[in-house]
């Protein structure tokens, strides 16, 4: 299951980067989970990017600034939500919304007009906790 799902996710990542996913976004985010430290989960996420594309990888994603998040979706290719358990339950609706966005609209600094940019980024995450998402 993991290999098939990961393969499908990687196809979605490539489609997102190539601009082939204009009608829908890559709304799936694989989560690497191990209770033990030192399993190199974060390192695995980082090496998914080819050396030439490492400037388009980020592992600092702050959900408190929604406009900043939207800009990162247009600037980066892979966003690692490292230590996913640090995000609060109240932030999950905003994250879900961000993961489903296909086109981004925001005003850049010192500009009066809004920019419309395609979403490039896909998500991946890591955690040491196994009970990450719970529905009430």
Spans of features found by a protein language model:
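Conserved nucleotide-state-sensing and coupling region of NTP-binding domains
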Residues: 29-31, 85, 112-115
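AAA+/SF3 P-loop NTPase mechanochemical coupling elements
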Residues: 68-74, 107-126
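Charged, alpha-helix-enriched surfaces in structured cytosolic catalytic cores
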Residues: 5, 89-90, 118
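Hydrophobic/aromatic beta-strand patches that form the interior of the parallel beta-sheet core
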Residues: 30, 79-80, 122-124
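Conserved AAA+/SF3 P-loop NTPase catalytic/coupling segment centered on the Walker-B
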Residues: 76-99, 131-136
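Short, glycine/serine-rich, charged loops/turns that create anion-binding
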Residues: 37, 128-130
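P-loop NTPase catalytic core of nucleic-acid-dependent motor ATPases
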Residues: 1-75
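Conserved catalytic/switch belt of AAA+ P-loop NTPases
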Residues: 92-115
